[in-house]
């Protein structure tokens, strides 16, 4: 419990008549008050005595404490001062007390002031008028104290408003003796150095800053008092960790995804992990918040309180009525226009700046009202400023006395009560507070950071040989006189370093114990390993008899530890034996495999029963079991089979490479022949085979056992040529249409090349291929001309047949005379144009003239000639039948040969049908021409006998039948020709 901080809040009040009591270390330091009243005290009236009612004062958070205080009397001087104050009530009523928050709560108490139990002053009762007394007995002006828990913030003194009342020094009444009593009634408050103070914002400063958000979402802060704004968060609004981080170069930020990272504003570096420097300051801040508001960041309050208590106990015993303030009352600072005097030179206290509360002749002191109903009059000290400063400095100087002096003063001021009745904690706190007075260092320390100071303090603990089981009080007695004790300025830091040192010491001791125990284990294990007689089957009882005299066996005291190490050693021996057996077996297997590899008589198809006798002769075979030998032998045979398969696979791959090379060479030969024109799309395999069968390239590919044959490659090349020729033919057709070049039966190859030379590059196309395309196009042009000629012949015959139906047309008729007759006929007007119809008309008239002349000549021919003519006609009929049969045979022959000369654009069947139709059409044309000649001959023969009636009758009848038959044949031929025209139009592909 001595190592823990006491709660720095309100402590229970103890009666001053008890023995001397030291304040706990966590108590706030007392405050030095100097009261200089500015109002002339009245002399006629007496001051009212103190009420027996309990003294009440506002503590932390506004809680009113009821403290039992015995009735006492004031000094006679107080009566005179109060008399003057009653004489001038008008002036006193004008005095207004303005109470301002005084910062953090501070205890204004002096419980360690010793008051004799029998001491008392006469204090007659005087009725005090309600005139607004500015002291404790005046109007109930209750001081309000903020609930902040630190000393930071601005200290605002109470302001006195109203007219200033000037008086002379002789009008002031002193109510406290100016000797030792002055130090009793003026407790010292030692202000820490400015370097050690870390001011926290006051409640008023916190309300001055207002947080706002800009249009872009950024936060800024505005001060209502100074009318200034800033992007940076003010120190007054920072949290505990933010204030701690402000002492470092690192700053915490958050990424868009919420992760926290840390940025160093000096080195411009960022990291995802918290730097060690930030961790240290945050831990210190957290420890300070746990230990109390005065544990970190300011000088340790317990140290200041201890010094103040020491100074108070060192002073002689004063009047009991002059101990006025209680625990829990906050620090009250009263300032004046006078300058604060400097501290006494040569003072050994580390706290240099001491607050001295002074009041000038123009100011009045303000104290808290200790009751809500009845106020208690507390005397006000009146003395000169020089005397007060001197006494205050003496009090501060006395705080550095030795332990003996402090103890002596405490004993003198203690009241009745045995020493044994004091509690242990109070006694320990007293010892600690007394030993704390020795922290007056003659030398100052300077460290780069706090870690160095902690290391120095830990080195002090180490040099003092502080044990891991020591308490803080034990360590204090050993290290308090060392100058390194002041390396850490606050008691919280020293205790934290002390606890860390104890933890490190315990850890080091534990590590040392483990190392010593480990060495004993290793020695015992080494003893077992050195013994050759130990085997995996050795028993523990036998082991004990073997090593019972060995020092290493005795050093290990616990029987359980010995047996555990022995069992572990036996397990290791078993494991080593098993591993050794496995290694031996593995080595024997490897040697046996090498032996099998050296035997040339073992083949992939060898049998174990045939080679077993030959293998067992070798010693390497006898090292293994029979089953192991058989398994290894079978595995070796499988390896041989795999090797043989791999060899075959490699040979097969090499053969495939050779055959692929032969095919590539034959491909090159085909490409070469295509380039020279020896191989075209119409080349036949039998013809090509006769050319290449004697070449070595063909012989090489013919020897291939797999892959494509030479014929397959040839057919692929021909098929590719057909596709390329078809593309070339389409391209040339487009060029001819673009150039408007028409091929005719009389066109030559040179003319054809010239017409397409500008659009097609001939160096890339052999003339052989180009000649094939030209021949196909020329044949197509001839077929087209023949078709046009046949079409015109049919139209001529059709028109002539129509002209024969007109009776008005004779051999002497002319076109101009009968033009209206021909043009007026619908059938005639649809056939050709006018010039064509005129030409046909003139041809028909010429035919009539020839017939007329032939008839005239036939009249002169004798009868026997006509009979010969009839015989010739029969002979002509038989000849006609023979021609028909011959045409039919030619048709079949051409149909059989058509499959080799079919068009590349049409299927073979369609090409054969076309060739059949062509031969049929040619046969029909020959037949028609023969028939027409026969008809003409028949007509001429009848015309020759036109003089007889029978001949004339017969001629007229034949003429009508011939006309009807011709008309029917004409219609059939027109339908047939129309179908043929549709098949052979220019837009169709036609023959290749």
UniProtKB/Swiss-Prot annotation:
Changing residue 216 to A: No effect on CTD binding. Binds the phosphorylated C-terminal domain (CTD) of the largest subunit of RNA polymerase II and functions as a scaffold for RNA processing machineries. May be involved in pre-mRNA splicing. InterPro entries: FF_domain (IPR002713), FF_domain_sf (IPR036517), Prp40-like (IPR039726), WW_dom (IPR001202), WW_dom_sf (IPR036020). Residues 361-386 have a biased composition (Polar residues). The gene is PRP40B. Expressed in roots, shoots, rosette leaves, cauline leaves, stems and flowers. Changing residue 250 to A: Decreased binding to CTD. GO terms for cellular component: nucleus. It comes from Arabidopsis thaliana. This is Pre-mRNA-processing protein 40B.
